[in-house]
């Protein structure tokens, strides 16, 4: 008789209940292998539209399609068994109307099995968040530096450097909470504003380039692992995998050229005839 142990996946409601408790741990993930490794240590994994820049080589997140997000979301769901999986709704998939957003968000949930979607924006997107939440789709918000608005911001610029700009970001946060979001990513804002948002909201704030006082933190996994040459100010490198990868590939290439690979132990031989 075999015993099958079912791993209980974290839900959006559980993330919401973590407000003010032990910090919430999160990373981005784009494929099954990295999701499987990160899963035991993360409360949620974000299939971010940053996949367009990190994996596909785009300069911004704007070219990312709904089909791309679903494909990567399916891969992450195969690798992650415990963490809540949240999938970004890409640029152009939700801004037109709440009905458009519901059509695309419901497709994401149905085709991937993920537990929530994430939308960028504040006051202007609150009606859409409300529409989705009332129809059973958990939504994570995203305010501050919103990469899909890179052209409006004139680049990836820190938000809230002048206190005169705080009022709009605070209004965005309040509107998202009132609309029913279970958590909100606070990206690229000055530390005092991130603390203020965390104190004023009853839902968890997930910081990226914000404050250690947020209710949780998220980083792009590849940034944290040490891929790429440009390191944003808010990223701490916990590895140097790009150098290790280059070193391993060079060693492989050298061994192939010198015929040191494959060795006798790494090739198949005929079976010895008996008798």
From Swiss-Prot:
It is found in: Cytoplasm. Its cofactor is Mg(2+). 3-methyl-2-oxobutanoate binds at residues 49-50, 88, 118. This is 3-methyl-2-oxobutanoate hydroxymethyltransferase. NCBIfam families: panB, PRK00311.1. Its main location: cytoplasm. One of its GO terms (molecular function) is 3-methyl-2-oxobutanoate hydroxymethyltransferase activity. Pathway: Cofactor biosynthesis; (R)-pantothenate biosynthesis; (R)-pantoate from 3-methyl-2-oxobutanoate: step 1/2. It catalyses: 3-methyl-2-oxobutanoate + (6R)-5,10-methylene-5,6,7,8-tetrahydrofolate + H2O = 2-dehydropantoate + (6S)-5,6,7,8-tetrahydrofolate. It comes from the Bacteria. Catalyzes the reversible reaction in which hydroxymethyl group from 5,10-methylenetetrahydrofolate is transferred onto alpha-ketoisovalerate to form ketopantoate. It holds the Pfam family Pantoate_transf. Binds 1 Mg(2+) ion per subunit. Keywords: Cytoplasm, Magnesium, Metal-binding, Pantothenate biosynthesis, Transferase. Belongs to the PanB family. Mg(2+) binds at residues 49, 88, 120. HAMAP family: PanB (MF_00156). The gene is panB. One of its GO terms (cellular component) is cytoplasm. The active site is at 187 (proton acceptor). One of its GO terms (biological process) is pantothenate biosynthetic process. Its EC number is 2.1.2.11.
């Amino acid at each position: 008789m075999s015993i099958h142990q079912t791993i209980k996946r974290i839900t959006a409601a559980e993330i919401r209940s973590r407000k003010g408790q032990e910090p919430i741990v999160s990373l981005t993930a784009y494929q099954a292998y990295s999701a499987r490794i990160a899963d035991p240590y993360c409360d949620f994994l974000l299939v971010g539209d940053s996949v367009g820049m990190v994996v596909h080589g785009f300069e911004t997140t704007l070219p990312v399609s709904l089909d791309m997000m679903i494909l990567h979301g399916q891969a992450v769901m195969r690798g992650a068994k415990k963490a809540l999986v949240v999938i970004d709704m890409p640029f152009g998939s939700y801004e037109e109307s709440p009905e458009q957003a519901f059509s695309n968000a419901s497709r994401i949930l149905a085709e991937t099995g993920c537990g929530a979607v994430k939308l960028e924006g504040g006051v202007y997107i609150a009606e859409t968040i409300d529409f989705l939440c009332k129809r059973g789709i958990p939504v994570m918000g995203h305010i501050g530096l919103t990469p899909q608005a890179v052209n409006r911001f004139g680049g990836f610029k820190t938000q809230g450097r002048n206190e005169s700009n705080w009022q709009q970001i605070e209004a965005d946060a309040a509107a998202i909470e009132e609309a029913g979001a279970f958590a909100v990513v606070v990206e690229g804002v000055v530390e005092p504003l991130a603390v203020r948002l965390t104190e004023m909201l009853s839902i968890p704030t997930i910081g990226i380039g914000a404050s250690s006082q947020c209710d949780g933190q998220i980083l792009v996994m590849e940034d944290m692992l040490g891929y790429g040459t440009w390191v944003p100010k808010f990223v701490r490198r916990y590895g140097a995998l790009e150098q290790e990868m280059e070193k391993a590939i060079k060693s492989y290439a050298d061994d192939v050229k010198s015929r040191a690979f494959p060795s006798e132990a790494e090739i198949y031989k005929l079976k010895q005839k008996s008798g």
